[in-house]
């Protein structure tokens, strides 16, 4: 009985780790705090602090209280993705978490970016890449005044 409990605990731990860090990076699986870096089809996981190819910056556009929404406070942000490379970024995936509390789930609360069902942000179809040393900006409106936690999950160039 004890060995069954140990086995079940081990399986639950593996399942939890797999559910928490499911991001596949080619033949690898990146862990929390890592970025999947894909250079000409070659994938590897690198520490997020070593990912200098791309950067995210957040700028507050404005904050207000909306009486029509129960006097809740909302903040509009511009998020700029900057390509620091000498080559184009072909695709980027940006992770979000519970701090992405959109005002509502419409194009009025997030624009110039695709929000996938799993909460990951990607470039929209009309912006298939980010040119070398260029930037791309998207916007969002969230409840409260704390910016959403956004982290580069994967970058392909």
Swiss-Prot record:
- Example of a GO biological process term: sporulation resulting in formation of a cellular spore
Name the domain of life: Eukaryota
What InterPro entries would the database entry show? Answer: CBM2/CBM3_carb-bd_dom_sf, CBM2_carb-bd_dom_sf, CBM_49, Dd_Spore_Germination_Stalk
Its subcellular locations are:
Secreted
Pfam families the record matches: CBM49
Q: Which UniProt keywords apply?
A: Developmental protein, Differentiation, Secreted, Signal, Sporulation
Any single GO molecular-function term of the entry would be:
hydrolase activity, hydrolyzing O-glycosyl compounds
* Record has Secreted as a keyword: yes
Q: For this UniProt entry, what's an example GO CC term? A: extracellular matrix
Task: Give the signal sequence positions.
Answer: 1-19
Q: Any idea what this protein is called?
A: Stalk-specific protein B
């Amino acid at each position: 009985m004890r060995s069954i409990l140990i086995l079940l605990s081990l399986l639950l731990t593996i399942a939890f780790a797999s559910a928490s860090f499911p991001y596949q990076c080619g033949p690898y699986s990146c862990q929390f705090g890592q970025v999947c870096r894909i250079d000409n089809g070659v994938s590897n996981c690198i520490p997020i602090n070593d990912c200098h190819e791309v950067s995210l910056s957040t700028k507050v556009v404005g904050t207000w209280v909306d009486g029509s929404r129960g006097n809740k406070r909302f903040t509009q942000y511009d998020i700029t993705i900057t390509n620091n490379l000498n080559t184009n970024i072909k695709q980027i995936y940006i992770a979000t978490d519970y701090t992405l509390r959109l005002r509502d789930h419409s194009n009025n609360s997030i624009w110039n970016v695709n929000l996938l069902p799993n909460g990951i942000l990607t470039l929209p179809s009309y912006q298939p890449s980010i040119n070398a040393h260029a930037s791309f900006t998207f916007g969002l409106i969230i409840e409260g005044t704390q910016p959403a936690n956004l982290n580069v999950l994967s970058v392909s160039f």
